[in-house]
Amino acid sequence: MPHASLPTENVLQGRTFDAVLFDMDGTLIDSTPAVDRSWAAWAREWGVAKDDTAHGRPARDIIEELVPADRVDEAIARVLALETADTDDIIVLPGAAALMTSLPEARRAIVTSCARPLAEARLAASAFPAPAVIVTIDDTPNGKPEPDPFLEGAARLGVDPSRCLVIEDAPAGLQAGRAAGCTTIAVTGTYPAAELDADLVVPGLDSLRIEVTPDGLIVHVESPKS
C-alpha cells in the first residue's frame, strides 16, 4: 500500500535533501502517444502482443520477454529507431519546467530508462530545460527496478543517495528509488495513486515547490495553479 494518498499533508515536512533525481517520461514530459505508436508499429512488425503494463521498464527487459534471445539486439535496435523517429505530440507536463529550473545545476538530474539518443530526442522535441546530468539505460549495467540508475545519478552529483529525492510516475521507478535508499515522490497520471508505493503521492509537479536553503532542499506541497 502507498505510504501516503493524494496529499493535503506533507509527510516530508521538516526534512531536507541534497538533490532531486527526476524520471523523464510520464514525470517531466508526456510522450505517451509517440510511445504507443512506436511500440504498436514494432509489435505489428514482429508479430507480438504489445505490453501495456511496461511503462518505466527498460526496452531490453520488455523485449527479452517477447522475442527469441538471438533476436533481442535486433529488436531493440528497431524499437529505438522507431521511437527516435517519432517525437510528435511530446509535451512538457504542468509544473515540470518550473520545478526543474528552480533547482541549482548541482542538485538536479534526470534518470531515465530510455537510451541516450531517445532521451535527447524527446527532450529536444519538447524543448524541456534539461539538466547537465542525465543518466540513461546506457550508463548502468541494470535498469529500473534495480537501484543502479539512481545510484549512478547520486554519484554523478556527488550526493549520498539517502539524501536524494526521487520523483517518479511508475512502480518500477519507485521500486528502484527505494532500493537505492532514496526518498520517493510519486506523481499520478500514468498510474493511479493506489498503485504507487511512495513516501508522498501528488497529482502532478505543479503541486510541488522545492525551496533551496543553506541546509538543503525543502519540499512544499501546494494546490496546483489553475
Language model features by range: what are they?
Residues 1-18, 101, 107, 116-226:
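Asp-based, Mg2+/Mn2+-dependent phosphohydrolase catalytic module
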Residues 111:
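Glycine- and other small-residue-rich loops at beta-strand/loop junctions that grip anionic moieties
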Residues 3-8, 13-107, 115-117, 128:
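N-terminal helical cap/lid subdomain that shapes the substrate entry/recognition surface
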